[in-house]
Amino acid sequence: PFGTNLIFDCGNIENFTFAIEICEDLWVPNPPSTNHALAGANVILNLSASDEITGKADYRRKLVEMQSAKNICAYIYSSTDLVFAGHNIIAENGTMVAQSKRFESSNITYGDIDLDKIATERQRMTTFYVNPDNEDYMNVSVKLKNKEVKVDRYIDKAPFVPSDTNKRNARCEEILEIQTWGLRRRLEHTGCSNAVIGISGGLDSTLALLVTVKAFDALRLDRK
C-alpha cells in the first residue's frame, strides 16, 4: 500500500506502531503526524532534507520536542547530510533522547524509547480514546527483529528533581508559588484570616508554614 493514511503495526513488539511523514509535513500548522498519533501510531518517523541557516537547528529541535509532547509519542527526525546539516533527532514525549552532531558526513543516531510509558501516558488522555477519523487509516502488519539489548538510556533515580542547581531552585520556587496561590485563593473564598499549623519540625510542616506565610503576605494579612 502507498499513501498518507498508513499505520504500521509491529505485532511481535508490544505497543510498537509507527507512521511516516515527510520533511516539511512537520512544519505546517496541522502536521499529518497529529492524525497519525490519533489513529494509534506511537512512533513517528520523518525523512527530511532540511536546509541549514543560522538559528534553525534550535528551532528544529524545539519543534520535534513539542510535536512529540503534543502527540505523546516518540518522534524520530532524520535529515540528509549531502548538502544539508544532517541533523538527526530522537524525542520522546517532549524530551530529547538523542541527537547527532551537524555537518558530519557519516553518523548513526540511536536511543532507547519507552513504548510502555507512551502507552500509559495516552491512557490518561481522553483525546486518544475515540477518534472518528481512524476509519480512514489502513493498518499494515510488519515484523521487526526483536532482540535483547542493554538499555543505553540514563534513568534518573530522582526524575522530578533537576540535577542542575539553577533549574532545581526554579522548580522549587515554582512549586512554592503554586501552593501559595492555591492557599491564597482558598483563604479569599472562605473569608478566613487566620490559620493554625502544627509544627513537628519535619519537612512537611515546615513547607506548610512557608506556604502559609507567603499566602498571608500576598493577602496583606497579619502573620500573627
Describe each region flagged by the PLM.
Residues 15-25, 45, 179:
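Active-site-proximal beta-strand elements of phosphoester/diester hydrolases
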Residues 71-72, 76-168:
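C-terminal beta-strand edge segments of enzyme domains
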Residues 24-109:
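CN hydrolase (nitrilase-like) catalytic-core segments centered on the catalytic cysteine
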Residues 33-35, 57-59, 100-103, 125, ...:
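Composition- and surface-driven signal marking solvent-exposed, interaction-prone regions
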Residues 3-20:
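Beta-strand-turn-beta hairpins that frame and shape the catalytic cleft
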Residues 42-44, 150-159, 179, 187:
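Active-site-adjacent bridging/hinge elements
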Residues 25, 142-143, 169-224:
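ATP-dependent adenylation/nucleotidyltransferase module used to activate substrates
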